[in-house]
Amino acid sequence: MIKLKDILNEVFDTNLLENNDDYRIFCDLDGVLVDFDKGVKQLTGGISFEDYVKTKGYDSLWSIINQNGSIWWSTLPWIADGHKLWSFIRNKDVTILTAGSTKNTGKLAIEGKKDWCLKNLSAIVPVIVTNNSHDKQQHAQPNHILIDDLPSNINEWKAKGGIGILHTTAEQTINELQQILRQ
């Protein structure tokens, strides 16, 4: 099977899309590239996800998110150091692996997240939107690296034989990726 990167490299006589074929990177969106929390604060008048859920309930927050439709998901801002991480991984064998959502936002989140990737990343970046975060582990293999900000996703990924990087900052994730890719 011919990969798009191979065709582009041949057409442009370049190795701009060079990657380490031994590894495939799966990168989460919310909390890694996208600032979900900032988006929630914009919807709730500055109240954080956690505080809003504590005071008004989980269902109330998801109701507000749903009222804003897929446009809310597609216009979420980049996380502060998201561009730095994306600049490092974009020319590697990378797939966006993100969860649709947990509270009745499935179709809206799927449409919005795919649109966000199209507008902010590239039309050629594969995007997989799972029904929930636990479904991410179905893509784990020994040479597959998951970058995710949720410890439970990393633990499930590793339990299925994949390599997991718990994302806290772009710098930390890049350092861990460099160590893995050097092996």
What are the residue ranges of the model-derived segments?
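Charge-dense, intrinsically disordered terminal/linker segments
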Residues: 1-23, 32, 58, 78-81, ...
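Active-site neighborhood of HAD-like aspartate-dependent phosphohydrolases
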Residues: 11-66, 159, 169
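A structural signal for well-ordered alpha-helical scaffolds and beta->alpha junctions
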Residues: 33, 37, 79-82, 109-114, ...
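Short glycine/proline-enriched coil/turn segments at helix->beta-strand junctions
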Residues: 45-46, 89-94, 121-125, 141-144, ...
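Substrate-recognition element of Asp-dependent hydrolases with the DxDx(T/V) motif
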Residues: 73-78, 82-110, 117
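Class I S-adenosyl-L-methionine
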Residues: 87-90, 114, 118, 155-158, ...
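Substrate-recognition "cap/lid" segment bordering the active-site pocket of phosphatases
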Residues: 97-144, 151-154
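Acidic, Mg2+-coordinating phosphoryl-transfer loop and its flanking beta/alpha structural elements
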Residues: 145-178
